[in-house]
Structure formats: C-alpha cells, structure tokens
Amino acid sequence: YFAPGASQYDRHLMYQTYDVTELVQEGENGLGCILASGWWSDSFSFRLYNYNYWGDRPSFLGRLVITYEDGHKETIVTDDNTWQYFGEGPYRYAGFFNGETYDARLEENYFNFSKSDFKADGLKKPEVITPVVMEEQEGIFPGAACWPAMNEKEPELVGSYQAPVHEVETFTAKSMTEPLPGTYIYDLEQEIAGVPVLKFKGKAGQKITIRYGEVLYPDLPEYKGLVGQMLQANLREASNEDTYYCK
C-alpha cells in the first residue's frame, strides 16, 4: 500500500522494483498501472489548503527491463507517444485524508486493463508533467519548522529503502450499534490504520458510505441528540470517508 511513500519529491523520488518474470508471455504483452494522488498531489495535511505541493494530478514514471537467455537486455519506458491514459475506471477518487470513492458499475470498463489487447472508449494521450517548483514555505504553528523545504537541485531517483506498508493483523469488530436507522457503528476497540472488509448486498447505483472515527459523542447535556453517534470534529477538515456505489 501507499508506494512510493512520502519524501520531498523535488529532491528524492523513491522507485519500487518488482520481479514480473512469471507474468511476461510470449508474443504481445501489456503493461498497466493504477494511480492515486498519494502525497504527490491532493491534500498534504489535515489543513486542506495544503494542496498539490508537487503536481496537480497523479503521475507515473516507469520502465520494464527484459533480460533474454542470451544475456542481452531490452528496456521499455513510459513514453507519451506509446502509452495511453484511461480515466473512466471504478476508482473515482482516492486520497489519504479524504478517503476513496469507488463505482463498481464501471468495473467492466476496467477489466484486463493491463492486457495487450485491452480496448476501451476514452483512451487518451498522456501528458508529460513538470514537478511544481517550491518557492514558498509554511509553518503549521508559529516558530515551528517550515515545510516543504526549498528546491535545491533536480530530483534524484533512489530505490526504496523502507519496508512497504502491508497487512500485519486482522481485527474483527467487537460490537455493533445502530444509533440512527440505517447507520451502523462497528467498534474494533483498537486504534488502527487499516483497510475495512465488509460484505453487503445492494441495488445498482446504491451508495454506501463508510466513515472512520476514534470516539463517540458522550452522554452529556451539550450533546443531546448526538449521544452514541460518531464524533469526527477532531479530524479537522479531513472528510475521512469511503464511498462505494453498488453494481
């Protein structure tokens, strides 16, 4: 999850390496990737005006190196003349602070996108993106260190030196409540950073909203009518919710 991680992208861009030997077939092959905003574009903190520090859209730089049995190598790189962009898949939005929007009705447009014979309406020519030049700094609090740091040189491509984010443990909800009709709260009794796993049935186009929080409104007079519901005021401007449209 979340590759390539957070760095000051105008200084260092960390790349990931994968062994795809078992995926390469004789004849024509297709190479595809799925992009989200990450730390590159979108929100950079819970203050939503800290936005698009490095670029204004998800971007990708990659290459495939094939080593043949006789030892010679062939390198295939991302190129705006040979690659194509498709923006009508089911992932409509994905961001660290505002969650993900997924429309399952668009999955058929998306199947086999990494196959050589993939065809879909709406394929577009990609653009070469120039990273944003950092000319100003901002501190969250008076006297605090400012960030991002100013540009000093061209970005350096370096191999990832950090362990990837991966699944460590699976938690099951300890309890469930329904403070409002059709609104269910699942309590894990544990602070985690993770991915929810839910099973449900719905009609095509039905919207399912999943929100996340740390505390519930307490039983106090000032919270009359809200007791037992999820409190998200401490999340500041981050919406912190996922939206799923059934197919």
Regions found by a protein language model. Give the residues of each.
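Extracellular/oxidizing-compartment recognition motifs
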Residues: Y1-K247
